[in-house]
Amino acid sequence: LECAQIGEVTDTGRLEYFRHGQKVADIPAFSLVLGGGAPVYDREYTRPAYMDEIKPYDPPAPADTELVSIAHRIMNSPNIASKRWVYEQYDHTVRTGNTNTNDPSDATIVRLKDTDKSLAVTVDCNSAYVHADPYIGAMIAVSEAARNIRCSGGIPLGVTNCLNFGNPYNPEVYYQFVHAIKGMGEACRKYGTPVTGGNVSFYNQSVLKDRTEPVFPTPTIGMVGLVEK
């Protein structure tokens, strides 16, 4: 990958900035780290009531005579049916770096020209899992991404994220956010995949009749891995 060296790591615990050889800034790194010296919001949050309501859910097993019709309904649902008709319209040969074909693949493989290495890239999240349990659901999202990388022959290297939630001033929504972050962090530590960046999108909600409904919590995980020849 093309890159430019912009500095070096030291053991001073400080960030020093230089311009034309002259030091122009000297800042304690601790003061810039969330959870360290940087300000952190400490909002009120409460466990959503629906989590206790859905926990004991145990749907009855369908009768044998209903299995075929149930399978048809499931496979016809836009949430379940294949999305190939959408993503296969993209020209995957752009810039001649993508080694994938239209065959099923757990991750996209992008070759690094002039090397014997490639990158495996995947994006994953099942918001229904996160809605049911934000902590475990976020761990599942990271785990799915790691599996996709490994099943494509790669070694997981790092993570970025796109965190989509409702109104953070809603204590139940903020609970989802807090516990999804904790679950994501726990899984990333397990896989040794640092979170190099990401973004947070709040206030994703819709007004339905007389109530405001937030979207399902969706901490989308983007993971990259290294595939060696």
Please place each PLM-identified region on the residue numbering.
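Glycine/proline-enriched, intrinsically flexible loops and inter-domain linkers
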Residues: L1-K229
